[in-house]
């Protein structure tokens, strides 16, 4: 992760005393996603039963580890992840900018991934079993800040069970996030849009056809029609200052209602199709 706190030398000093401690390192910085992918590949190739991601930034409480592990070890889930938002105190502990960005991305990730029961999509405190390790194509996983979001989409296509686990949000007092919220939200939103379309194609067309793709498609078409028709309404009203043709107003409202209903039904069908993956 391109850390500058002598992490490598510290790990090497301890690995000489403990043969179970294995250090994996990159010659070039590959981002957080690249580091996680390398670790997962090593775990897969060495027949590890459960692989856990715990960052070295002291923001993941080790006391939460048993709770993260239990669902995977007991066979209740293929992938478990921490959720800092379960706590009613989360908004007080998490930096405001990060909390706001996380909330937006969590909503978008629900839609893109099909895991409607999960939240706190940006947490990296996770556990994954050997079945999922062997099925996921780690070479295709996103390598940057959107890695957790991308992985959830890939797991959904593979019908892996995912469980959210309450964890304690750990942040230093007065800590300020270095994340540029506008860049992160737009870049990951674009990633989620692409992965959402990929999931619809892969899961509901190629692997097993589901009519919800028609509902999403019609919702999209009526959405475009809504924009065009309302633009014409505002053109008559604001630019020309004339009366709005009643047929135009009715068509705009019809398109808006149709787009909303088709999209909401598509989401509902998606939720029903994935409810067994909790």
Predicted features, each with a name:
Residues 1-9:
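A conserved acidic beta->alpha catalytic loop
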Residues 2, 85, 168:
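Short beta-to-alpha linker loops that shape the active-site pocket of alpha/beta-hydrolase fold enzymes
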Residues 4, 30, 58-59:
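Acidic metal-phosphate-binding loop of nucleotide-sugar-dependent transferases
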Residues 14-18:
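Short, conserved SAM-binding/catalytic segment
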Residues 21-45, 50, 62-145, 171-186:
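Acceptor/aglycone-binding surface of glycosyltransferases and processive sugar-polymer synthases
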